[in-house]
Amino acid sequence: MNSLARRAARGRRDGVRYALTAACAAACLSAQAGGFSIGAGAGVDHGKVDCVDGHACDRGSAHAKLFAGYALTDAIELQALAFDAGHFDGGDISPLGTPFGGRFKVNGIGIAAGYRWTFAPGWSLKGQLGVARVRTRFGYAAPFAGDASMTTTQPLVGLSLGYQIAPQWRLSLDVDETRFKVHTTRGPLRMVGVAAQFAF
């Protein structure tokens, strides 16, 4: 009887242990599934390009971005993003002193870590810091032909004011800033727009 009782007690303990392990695994999987998000945004941007006489000059454009995030905690999030900053018209001066004009096309990919502060029900403010690989392609205007491109690693900073419209949906007003470079032209790129984010 004692042996049977011990085996029964051991079986109950094992059952409890297995149940706790299964519950913990389910909770971990649930937490992981709830930590991922995807989103998209669009808006206007401004790129600092040099202007030369006789050629078009336009420092404003439109941008679009796609991003995916993973929330380590309710406040800390990792994000990977890709963006197309459109194009800017400007120019430069060759090493021999010859001015030339053309069009700058800028895009890139980046990673960042952010901290989200919830300051009111549904409202939050997030700041993030990371790095981006920014590609700038310059197409020469007549009378020249051809193009040149350069890819550089640049800092990436962002600020986002968000509102939780539903448990899985967030709308935000985003400001992202990085830099771009080609030839001797280098300067900041600022993107301002709205974004929608879906968590799953």
Predicted regions and their residues:
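Cleavable N-terminal export/targeting peptides
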Residues: 1-35
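Gram-negative (and chloroplast) outer-membrane scaffold detector with strong preference
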Residues: 34, 41-48, 65-141, 163, ...
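Outer membrane beta-barrel transmembrane domains
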Residues: 156-162, 172, 195
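Low-complexity, intrinsically disordered Gly/Pro/Thr-rich segments
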Residues: 175-182
